Swiss-Prot record:
Pfam family, one: GHMP_kinases_C
Described purpose of this protein according to its UniProt entry: Catalyzes the phosphorylation of the position 2 hydroxy group of 4-diphosphocytidyl-2C-methyl-D-erythritol.
Organism per entry: Bacillus mycoides (strain KBAB4) (Bacillus weihenstephanensis)
Superkingdom of this protein's organism: Bacteria
The EC number(s) this enzyme carries: 2.7.1.148
Protein name, entry field: 4-diphosphocytidyl-2-C-methyl-D-erythritol kinase
Residues reported in the UniProt entry to bind ATP: P94, V95, A96, A97, G98, L99, A100, G101, G102, S103, S104
Active site: K10, D136
GO BP: isopentenyl diphosphate biosynthetic process, methylerythritol 4-phosphate pathway; terpenoid biosynthetic process
Catalysed conversion reaction: 4-CDP-2-C-methyl-D-erythritol + ATP = 4-CDP-2-C-methyl-D-erythritol 2-phosphate + ADP + H(+)
Coiled coil location: none
Length: 289
């Protein structure tokens, strides 16, 4: 038996860090929303009791380092599944980009194997399992738009922002999330107004959203990788309505309302940055149907 599952990327419209927890993680408060840039996973049931990861992308690990592998392993162990699975990942989301590509692959694996192996789990149960794999996996199980708190695994759903273009640009560098958080000095940063962002999203206020975007990690990543700051400046210069780094970077995104301006920004960045995408915000949450 075979199943195809979509794994959409996310961006952060607002990201704040409140402090460091006793378990070593940071306490966060952020707003994430899914976008129409997605990996595609093909899950094929195997009679043998093993997990196989396949991908043409050389940056995708084919062992237990892969979060999709970890998701399959978790379900096998928790529910004593004796079957195996082959997971083919068609990678579209850039790797290590601040877009939750690996987390979304894990979430898609949880949703897909729930069907393939007839586990009968609810989406809330899958999200709870996702938290055992990684901080963003719970959100990725649901998709849509949500406030994420705790270490990112506590999810409260809110309305979806008004539809618009999202232009993404990723430089050819990797950013260590651990290094970014390690260099964060909470008493020396400007904290975004996450509550205000929730308010303007719930009112469908596109201009308010553009005025309120913020990411407390930006200045840290910019200091470590000045090319990320340069991409943000270029995107602003080309006329994006709002520009922000997603997650710990290095991907920068711009929100754009008009098609003509989207094309201008996209074409302008293509000569400046290796990976550029123009996609839409996604609509509602994922379902198990």
């Amino acid at each position: 038996m075979k199943l195809l599952v979509k794994a959409p990327a996310k961006i952060n419209l607002s990201l704040d860090v409140l402090g460091k927890r006793q378990d070593g993680y940071h306490e966060v408060k952020m707003i994430m929303t899914t976008i129409d840039l997605a990996d595609r996973l093909e899950l094929t049931e195997l009679a043998e009791d093993r997990i196989e990861i396949l991908s043409h992308n050389r940056y995708v690990p084919d062992d237990q380092r892969n979060l999709a592998y970890q998701a399959a392993k978790l379900l096998k162990v928790k529910f004593n599944v004796k079957k195996g699975v082959s997971i083919t990942i068609e990678k579209t989301i850039p790797v290590a980009a601040g877009l939750a590509g690996g987390s979304s692959d894990a979430a898609a694996t949880l949703r897909g194997l729930n069907k393939l192996w007839n586990l009968g789990l609810t989406i809330d149960e899958l999200a709870k399992l996702g938290a055992e794999i990684g901080s963003d996996v719970s959100f990725c199980v649901y998709g849509g738009t949500a406030i994420a708190t705790g270490r990112g695994e506590e999810i409260e759903h809110i309305k979806t922002p008004p539809s618009c273009w999202v232009v993404l640009a990723k430089p050819h560098i990797g950013v260590s999330t651990a290094d970014v958080y390690g260099n964060l000095k909470l008493n020396r940063v400007t904290h975004p107004n996450v509550d205000k962002m929730v308010e303007v999203i719930n009112h469908g206020d596109y201009k308010g959203i553009c005025d309120t975007v913020g990411n407390v990690l930006e200045d840290v990543t910019f200091a470590m990788h000045p090319e990320v700051a340069r991409i943000k400046s270029q995107m602003k210069r080309f006329g994006a309505d709002a520009v922000l780094m997603s997650g710990s970077g290095p991907t920068v995104f711009g929100l754009v309302h008009h098609d003509s301006r989207m094309h201008r920004i996209y074409n302008g960045l293509k000569g400046f940055c290796e990976q550029v995408y123009a996609v839409r915000l996604l609509g509602e949450r994922e379902t198990l149907e």
